[in-house]
Amino acid sequence: RGSFTLSPISLTIQMGEIFAILGRTGSGKTVLLEAISGMFPGDTGSILLDGTDIRDIPPGQRKLGLVYQDYGLFPHMKVKENISYGLKMHGYSKKEQDSRAQELMEMLSISHIGDQYPGTLSGGESQRTALARALALAPQVLLLDEPFSALDPATRQSLYQELRRIHRHFGCTIIFVTHDFLEARTLAGRAAILLDGELQTVTDTARLMDGHFSAEVERFLGRNQIITAPGRKQEKRIVQ
């Protein structure tokens, strides 16, 4: 992605889990997410889905759903047309397209905006529309790039619940990018912490509040260490 380079990364994500890619802005989180999606051809390494390199699978058959940070909705299409677009490209009948779009709009509480255009939507409505479109083809893996960063707190909490419901209903793996470790802890069971293009650690999110990490990760998590005596440290943990 431009001139940004990730250091070699080895990462295993279990099917069916909710997994966070966590780090500061500019640390390479989105680049890693796009690499997982198979967006970059690459000449080294592999990205395996059920044992097959994702880059060897034709894009239309990868069983991936991707939600971009800016939602990526087609401005000239109505909400229901955005949602059914992938179905149309895969040869589904108009009846099947309409039925699936309606099902997803009802599930995500956006039936009332089906005939509206993206330019008229709130941030929460745009995010729900983007989620519905990504789910239309029943992906095995749902990839989300900073899905909650531009939303107000109430909408964010509502979408946390929606994402959990999606996970229960579809049983898909969910991988999302965030800079907020509290958000990662709220939604994900595990997180990869990425700083300056390097994978620092993979940890259970329950440990983000009080686990012991490298100095760089501790700084990212907003913690201070106070030296109290020569050769001895007393840790003062401050969560910002």
Please annotate each region the language model reported:
Residues 22-24:
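The feature captures the beta-strand-to-loop junction immediately N-terminal to the Walker
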Residues 88, 95-113, 164-165:
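Conserved ABC ATPase "signature" region
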Residues 117-121, 125-127:
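Conserved ABC ATPase signature
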Residues 136-140:
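A short, proline-enriched helix->beta-strand linker immediately N-terminal to the Walker B motif
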